[in-house]
Amino acid sequence: MEIDKVFCDTIMYQDLEILQDYLDTFKLDPQLTLILKKYKHASPFWKSDEKSFWIFEGILHDEAERVKQLNGVKTRNKVGFIYIKQIFYDIVELLLEATNDKKASSIDSRCVVCYENEICIKIQPCNHFVVCKSCFNRLNTCPMCRSKINKS
């Protein structure tokens, strides 16, 4: 699963590098390399929250595509550079906010099956405490270890 990778191995990191490459062509802002390197080794990245991971990856990919198009239209244009630079900073800011939100939130207390409801059931006999009641009722095996669930 992509969420188990180190941040520098993710699609998001590659898209951020694409944005940085476009900005580096202008050679106007050496700080961008430092910004990207600062967050390069964020791992694990949004552990157990695949939904948010893919939403953020989609936003980042769309912005990277928009920058590719802008770069073709506004080559070596200072207005184009400023706009692309702002996109880059906005994306890094989104990344930081999301990471901080994950640290502050109770993301680890959400069901590993639906990612929506609070965990409230301890699975027997393995004792994994990872699912909500509605998901538990649909399961025959533990989503963590695949052992057969004793529902008595």
Swiss-Prot record:
* Keywords linked to the UniProt accession: Metal-binding, Zinc, Zinc-finger
Q: Where are the zinc fingers (RING-type)?
A: 111-146
Q: Which InterPro entries match?
A: Znf_RING, Znf_RING/FYVE/PHD
Reading the lineage from the top rank, the first entry is Viruses
For this UniProt entry, the molecular function terms from Gene Ontology, in alphabetical order, are: ubiquitin-protein transferase activity; zinc ion binding
Q: Which Gene3D superfamilies does this entry report, sorted A to Z?
A: Zinc/RING finger domain, C3HC4 (zinc finger)
Report which residue ranges the record marks as coiled coil: none
The Swiss-Prot or TrEMBL record describes its family as follows: Belongs to the IIV-6 157L family.
- This chain belongs to the protein called Putative RING finger protein 157L
